[in-house]
């Protein structure tokens, strides 16, 4: 009788040890699986959609452009020292900043929130009940750097005139795309794509921009 009771206690002890080892192994395996799981599975679905849209937005397009400084961000409300001019480009407009803001108060330190297209496009809304601009590209480079592209050798392109100049390196860009067609000012809502791409421009009186 005593032998049977000892055996029973011994078997129960082994069973408890086995359960403990199994539970520890299971937790370790679960931790290993979580460690190897891609982080994007924990992101909101809209973040994944934005990433996919950025990849899809890599195609060539003719668009509007505004040159801004790459280290500091110009406030969307322009001072009197800033001269802006618009050129008609195939039915759309291209805005050029001939002189950037000189006052220190006219700049904001680089911030991703400032790169939001809804913030940067705010200064473009001058009248209500007008069609929103469909596409707009902000070039975050020194104006002299962009201007120097016109000194590079001519290259063939699909823009009007067929002769263009290509930037020697990718430029820091913010691509703004209207979220839904048919919107009218002041209710213009844009998707924001921050990227680096080579630009191709014409350097005649009517400048055009192409993104590669």
UniProtKB/Swiss-Prot annotation:
Q: Pfam families, from UniProt? A: RnaseA
Q: Tell me where the signal peptide lies.
A: 1-24
CDD domains listed in its UniProt record: RNase_A (cd00163)
> Which locations, inside or outside the cell, does it occupy?
Secreted
Residues carrying a glycan: 129, 204
Kindly state the tissue distribution recorded for this protein. Male-specific expression in proximal caput of the epididymis.
Query: How is the protein altered post-translationally, as described in the entry?
Result: The N-terminus is blocked. Glycosylated.
According to the UniProt entry, its GO molecular function terms are: nucleic acid binding
A GO cellular-component term linked to this record? extracellular region
Highest taxon of the lineage: Eukaryota
Coiled coil stretches, renumbered:
none
Q: Which GO terms describe its biological process?
A: defense response to Gram-positive bacterium; epithelial cell morphogenesis; heterotypic cell-cell adhesion; male gonad development; positive regulation of cell-cell adhesion; positive regulation of flagellated sperm motility; regulation of fertilization; seminiferous tubule development
Q: What is its main location?
A: secreted
Keywords attached to this Swiss-Prot or TrEMBL record, sorted alphabetically, are: Cell adhesion, Fertilization, Glycoprotein, Secreted, Signal
Q: Which family does it belong to?
A: Belongs to the pancreatic ribonuclease family.
Q: What does this protein do?
A: Secreted proximal epididymal protein required for post-testicular sperm maturation and male fertility. May be involved in sperm adhesion to the egg zona pellucida. Does not have ribonuclease activity.
Q: What is this protein called?
A: Inactive ribonuclease-like protein 10
Naturally occurring in which organism (per UniProt): Rattus norvegicus (Rat)
- Whichever gene encodes this chain, its name is Rnase10
């Amino acid at each position: 009788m005593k032998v049977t009771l000892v055996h029973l206690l011994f078997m129960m002890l082994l069973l408890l040890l086995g359960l403990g080892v199994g539970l520890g192994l299971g937790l370790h395996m679960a931790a290993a699986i979580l460690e190897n799981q891609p982080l994007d599975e924990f992101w909101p679905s809209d973040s994944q959609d934005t990433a996919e849209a950025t990849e899809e937005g890599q195609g060539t397009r003719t668009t509007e452009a505004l040159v801004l400084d790459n280290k500091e961000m110009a406030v969307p409300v322009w001072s009197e020292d800033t001269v802006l001019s618009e050129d008609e480009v195939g039915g759309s407009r291209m805005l050029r900043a001939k002189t950037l803001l000189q006052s220190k108060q006219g700049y904001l330190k680089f911030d991703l929130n400032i790169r939001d297209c809804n913030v940067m496009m705010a200064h473009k809304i001058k009248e209500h009940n007008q069609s929103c601009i469909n596409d707009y590209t902000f070039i975050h480079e020194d104006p002299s750097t962009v201007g120097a592209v016109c000194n590079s050798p001519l290259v063939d392109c699909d823009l009007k005139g067929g002769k263009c100049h290509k930037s020697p390196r990718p430029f820091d860009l913010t691509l703004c795309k209207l979220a839904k067609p048919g919107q009218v000012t002041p209710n213009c809502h844009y998707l924001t794509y921050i990227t680096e791409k080579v630009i191709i421009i014409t350097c005649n009186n009517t400048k055009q921009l192409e993104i590669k």
